[in-house]
Amino acid sequence: MDLIRSHVMVCGGTNCSSSASGEIIREFERQIAEKGLEKEIKVVRTGCFGMCEAGPVVIVYPEGAFYARMTVENVTRIVDEHLVKGRVVKELLYKEAVDEDNKVKSLDSVDFYKKQRRVALRNCGVIDPENIDEYIAFDGYKALGKVLTEMTPQEVIDVMLKSGLRGRGGAGFPTGMKWKFAAASQSDKKYVCCNADEGDPGAFMDRSILEGDPHVVIEAMAIAAYAIGADQGYIYCRAEAQL
């Protein structure tokens, strides 16, 4: 097994992608391969980190160095100085990512993040959205496993009703009620439909979670399917979404 000493997390969300994050990823991969470091350094395309105004965003672990407004031209400096020599390129860091003593601050100590408690977006910017193993490593599909082995469909619906969870749309309709009505509906065939269409121009709520943590959507749909008696599901999103 290769021992990875550094992870280069590059935002692959819609905003950063429109600012050439794909080219940045390819340039990191090219230069790392040229130096024969591909078994030591892993480049990961992640979902949105949330701070789109600072994009393209690159975070290098284990230091947690938060590089903002990255360009293809700056990749060489980070590879040569940070990844090869172990020296963080502080002048390329986000302005709040260095403290008064000129030390690198953790991401959660930056003002934008320190009061946040991510729930639905907890894995965005943390895992490779296309790698199911990384999702499982962060307790992915654990809830589905519990539902299928320890709970009846009605018990799942009861939990949803008690939770008070509501839809993210304007109506805020209780999710548990939706599942209750769907379960009670008599039909030979039932489906779970995920409406991932952004109703408002310029909105990125649904797109962010689909791009950054698609397995959490699939897991939730599977739980819903079990609760209401469905065996198929569909995700609806617009064709222009670059997922």
List each model region and its residues.
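Feature of Fe-S/electron-transfer and energy-metabolism proteins
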Residues: 1-243
